[in-house]
């Protein structure tokens, strides 16, 4: 049995000729015929080469792997009970699901507070991020949860001003921070600025802290979609040259006269901008953390990807030793705005396995009374049941879940609906709910009451879409928690989920469902 689909995918806009008869190992048609125009990935690579490495079309899509891992979070079920309540009086009139508290506080001083136990954990310099930032920033701020400005935002900004080799002013980063802050209320939420190798060389964190007043900064080791640096596509020659001047790897060389001629005659239409891979050492990590604290950072986060177990151990150990405030662990499979497609599917430690190792490592340090940061886990999460399972799997160390593709989808849908309302071309599927923001978006009336008429009318529908999606997740999570009789997040435990297979139990250490409550059941039956 193969876990992977090879040589054909909607991600690369490729397909087989004999779609019903495929060789499972190569992904090739069982009869590869002379004269075929080459619609499969091999065939398309014969004429477009490296372009076919990446999902397409760039700039209007987000992407995640389609590989089916042997074990995933669907291999666990949530346990409910009829007895008692944790975090509230065991009273049927009090222990109702709207009373469930899903707020979370993190940070060395518990100074970061969020209405919801999830965050958007890195939206960077891709077009899909920039074009939907308004909805993502405002929606996140209104919901009172965190949003991370990802890597390369400053480096990609053509309007950045430099003075003596250091940033003196930005347009895009400043805009992104301001959009969030303008809608942040009562101190809930946080805007986080992330930095990779190139960002560090440009001193993005120092600028964000000292000039924009950003309190939360994140060191980026990697992400789940790839084990190389971030990349985007560039359609403008001058911008490609600018990025190379700023220290990025740009392919092909935008200053090569032959490349320029080929680009101008349309032989290719996009350059690739790549970031460098980091070189982690404890010494350099310690220096970076110390430098950020001296620059004025109040909270320091670390994000790591689906690297081998030793690197996960480094992330946990360094976060403990150097008092990091939040460690985010992103697992294999994506998502991304642009990453190599085969890499996304075939590298890294999958979610359940990575999160299980994370729990083991955190528990080991906790048993030694070592400091542990709050932990967030990523892994293709999109719904409340997955959030519950992830919090339970990593309890008591995992405090939040990181997401990106699902919130972007909600913001994009909200934006698109707004455009159809303005154009008076609402699709039938949507029109059955109404023909205005107030009728279509179920949270519109509460948002109008919260913001007032004037501010509500200015609210982008992308933000309403994200806020409404979050409202659904919040109610769904409260219902699941009430069913497990856990009325605040700190009461969720590993015993609140059960493994449906022996393999899932073996990997995670979560009890197999037939072994759950075995001793307690035996005692109850002694009547």
Regions found by a protein language model. Name each.
Residues 20-51, 368, 412-414, 419, ...:
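Cysteine-cluster motifs in flexible loop/terminal segments that predominantly coordinate metals
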Residues 150, 299-303, 368, 484-492:
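Flexible, glycine/charged-enriched surface loops at secondary-structure junctions
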Residues 395, 417-418, 422-424, 434-527:
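Catalytic or ion-coupling anion/metal-binding cores of large enzyme and transporter domains
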């Amino acid at each position: 049995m193969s876990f992977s689909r090879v040589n054909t995918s909607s991600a690369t806009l490729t397909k087989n000729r004999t779609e019903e008869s495929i060789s499972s190992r190569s992904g090739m048609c069982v009869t590869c015929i002379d004269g075929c125009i080459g619609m499969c990935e091999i065939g398309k690579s014969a004429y477009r080469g490296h372009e076919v490495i990446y999902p397409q079309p760039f700039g209007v899509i987000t992407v995640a792997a389609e590989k089916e891992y042997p074990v995933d979070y669907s291999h666990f079920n949530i346990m409910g009970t009829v007895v008692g309540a944790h975090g509230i009086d065991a009273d049927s009139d009090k222990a109702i699901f709207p009373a469930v508290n899903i707020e979370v506080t993190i940070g060395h001083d518990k100074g970061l507070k969020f209405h919801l136990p999830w965050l958007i954990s890195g939206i960077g310099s891709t077009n899909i991020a920039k074009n939907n930032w308004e909805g993502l920033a405002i929606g996140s701020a209104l919901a009172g949860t965190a949003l991370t400005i990802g890597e390369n935002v400053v480096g990609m900004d053509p309007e950045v001003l430099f003075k003596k080799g250091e940033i003196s002013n930005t347009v895009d980063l400043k805009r992104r921070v301001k959009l969030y802050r303008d809608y942040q209320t009562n101190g809930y939420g946080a805007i986080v600025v992330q930095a990779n190798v190139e960002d560090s060389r440009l001193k993005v964190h120092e600028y964000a802290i000292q000039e924009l007043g950003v309190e939360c900064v994140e060191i980026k080791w990697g992400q789940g979609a790839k084990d190389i640096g971030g990349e985007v596509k560039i359609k403008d020659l001058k911008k490609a040259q600018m990025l190379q001047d700023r220290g990025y790897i740009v392919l092909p060389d935008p200053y090569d006269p032959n490349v320029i001629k080929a680009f101008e005659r349309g032989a290719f239409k996009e350059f690739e901008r790549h970031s460098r891979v980091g070189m982690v050492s404890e010494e350099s990590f310690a220096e970076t953390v110390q430098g950020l604290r001296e620059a004025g950072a109040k909270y320091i986060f670390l994000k790591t990807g689906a690297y081998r177990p030793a690197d996960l151990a480094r992330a946990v150990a360094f976060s403990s030793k150097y008092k990091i405030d939040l460690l985010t662990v992103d697992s294999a499979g994506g998502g991304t705005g642009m990453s190599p497609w085969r890499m996304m599917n075939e590298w890294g430690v999958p979610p359940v396995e990575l999160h299980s190792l994370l729990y083991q490592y955190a528990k080991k340090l906790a048993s030694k009374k070592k400091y542990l940061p709050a932990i967030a886990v990523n892994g293709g999460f999109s719904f409340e049941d997955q959030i519950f399972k992830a919090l339970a799997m990593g309890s008591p160390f995992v405090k939040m879940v990181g997401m990106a593709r699902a919130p972007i989808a909600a913001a994009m849908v909200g934006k698109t609906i707004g455009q159809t309302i303005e154009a008076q071309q609402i699709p039938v599927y949507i029109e059955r709910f109404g023909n205005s923001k107030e009728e279509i978006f179920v949270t519109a009336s509460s948002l109008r009451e919260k913001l007032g008429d004037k501010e509500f009318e200015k609210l982008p529908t992308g933000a309403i879409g994200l806020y409404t999606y979050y409202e659904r997740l919040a109610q769904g999570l409260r219902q699941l928690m009430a069913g497990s009789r856990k009325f605040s997040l700190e009461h969720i435990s590993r015993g609140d989920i059960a493994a449906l297979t022996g393999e899932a139990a073996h990997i995670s250490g979560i009890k197999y469902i037939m072994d759950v409550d075995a001793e307690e059941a035996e005692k109850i039956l002694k009547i």
